[in-house]
């Protein structure tokens, strides 16, 4: 059985986990408000990062919750995207193959948090960590991130 949003948030809360919540489809502002209200009802909004391939969803989140972590999902990075993310105070969640040490540095210089997906190779995870990526999405936590990599200063 697939949990409802409320049940999912309750599970995250029970185990003290950050929720990375993907808005998979385009949502009307009214529907985004309903989603936010469910999360607020559980008292867990401070532990949620919203992500979406739909840029309008991210703009709606930003309008409704100016300080809420929100990351635009994409496969590619270009200068226009960086400008838009910086202007709208959004983070980036990008396919890991698009990342380089240089563009991570460029994104950080513009105040943009960098998340990447999906990294299941330990060597690639270590490389991305050494480059300064902020988050890694993985299917295999134990294989993707070693304690030495995630706990270094």
Enumerate the predicted regions with their spans.
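C-terminal active-site rim and adjoining tail of enzyme catalytic domains
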Residues: 1-2, 71-153
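Metal-dependent phosphodiesterase/phospholipase catalytic core, i.e.
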Residues: 1-76, 88-90, 94-95, 108-110
